Structure formats: structure tokens, C-alpha cells
UniProtKB/Swiss-Prot annotation:
The record marks 195 as: Transition state stabilizer. The lineage of its organism: Eukaryota, Fungi, Dikarya, Ascomycota, Taphrinomycotina. CDD domains: PFA-DSP_unk (cd18538). It comes from Schizosaccharomyces pombe (strain 972 / ATCC 24843). Cleaves the beta-phosphate at the 1- and 5-position of soluble inositol pyrophosphates. Has exopolyphosphatase activity in vitro but does not appear to contribute to the homeostasis of cellular polyphosphate. This is Inositol diphosphatase siw14. GO terms for cellular component: cytoplasm; cytosol; nucleus.
Amino acid sequence: MAIVFPFQLEKKLISITSDRDQISMSIPEVSSHDSCLNDCHSVNSEEQAKPVCCLELNAHKDGIKVVDTSNDASTFSNSPLVPDNFGVVYPGIIYRSACPRASNFNFLESLHIRTIISLRQEEYSEEDLHYFTKHHINYYHIAMPGSKHRKNDCISSSSNPDISDVDDLVRKTLQLLLNKENWPVLLHCSRGKHRTGIVIGCLRALMNWPVGNRLQEYISFSHPKEREVDEEYIQNFSSDPSLKSSLNDLKRYISDSSSELADVVLSSESPTVQAATVNETCRSPGS
């Protein structure tokens, strides 16, 4: 029998149903006239809360990995509130997704997103940029080239100008993600698969995740269109001292936080987190 845990993201009530190693996250449906910031009532039926994804929580000594393992991937992406391919990198700190639409902005507001980092080539519309300004959201546009046309045999070559450019953009993005002044932050590209997957894979490398776990997470968001060139980049990513020093704030928050990050029994040998070890409250830094 499944166990239901209320999972509070600020004022947005999300119920999580656990069945062994998987959890299904349900978000109360909100009409176009309702605000995601309003207090939500308890979920009492399937009509009141439609599951939008199935998640698998994997733990490592440095954090939690949340992976969409839905049998029907469209269930998650069709939610009117949640951006496509949405994922939690570190609760209350770093999130990932495909490019959010205007219909997703209320959900992002409920997470108290302070910064949005876009890796797309395309710019947001003037209307969207005005929304960011109005709601005091920092916005960074890092036009990272896609990996679709790059050759596998040159992905690790520092002499290749395309790869050198990607290296520089990845490091700039990681610096923004690790800057606590930007938290909570949403990272996205067009579909939240490849460019976003590369950056998050490199972040996991900084946090000493095993290569296999990094690749598993990348594939879970990009399947069935995972790219060997991306996987090779994640495998071969090498850090530098400036990035290592920027990890201190993130590691400090993870170790000191009273949110679920501090309450999960973390073990790299047993990566699955049992639902009973997850604290009910996920808060933003400083809340």
C-alpha cells in the first residue's frame, strides 16, 4: 500500500505517493483565475490531484537526484503548471527544465525562482522579459551551441574551437549555478535534454558523482534521443580550481539545511532513498 507524504514547496502543496522505490508527485490543478501562490487545500481524490510524474529519488553523499521514470512521459509534460522535462537538481536551490512557457510562470513563482539561465540560441520575447523584470527575476542568456552536429572524436580536443567555446560556456553556467545569490535558480535549454543535461552532468562531476550515475541521470532526461557526444563530454569533463572553490556554498547548504537534503540517509552504495527518510518540508535558502 502506498504511503502519501505532504511535500511543501513554500506555499504550494504537492503530495507525493510512495510505492517502494518510486514516488508519484501530484499537484493540485489550478484554474486560470487561481494563483499558484495561494494556499492549497489537502488533496482528497484523484479529481483534485492529477499525478504529473513518477520520480525515482537516488541519493549520493553530496545530494539527491530526482529522475522522471513515468511510463507515460507525456503525463508530466502535459501539466499546465509544470515546464516540460522539469527536474529537481537540489531542492530549493537548483531546478532544470525545457524552456518554460508563460503558462508555467506561476509554477516557477511558487518555487520562488530568483534566477533563470537559458542555454538556447533564441531569446525570450519582450513580454516574457518584461515579466522577469516585473517579478525581480535575474535572467542570463548563454547561447550554447547544440551537440547534434559535433563529432564524437573531437569532443575532448581543446584545440577544436567549437569544443573550447562549449567548455567556456559550461564553466560560466556552472559559476552562475553555484552562486548562492542566484538561488533558487532554473536552468533550461530548448527541451531540457542535451545542453541542460551536459551542464548538470558536469555539476554532478564537481560533486563527485560516479560516472555511471551522471550518465544515468543524463539518459533519464534525454531518452530516447540521448547523444553519445554528450555522454562523452560528461565523462571527460575536467574541473578547475575556481569551480572547486565555488562549491563551498552549495556543500555548506546541503550539510546544514534542515530540509530533506539533511534528513536523507545518503549512501553511494545504496542509491535509492526510502520515502520514509524524506522530510516533509523543502524550503528555499534563507527561508
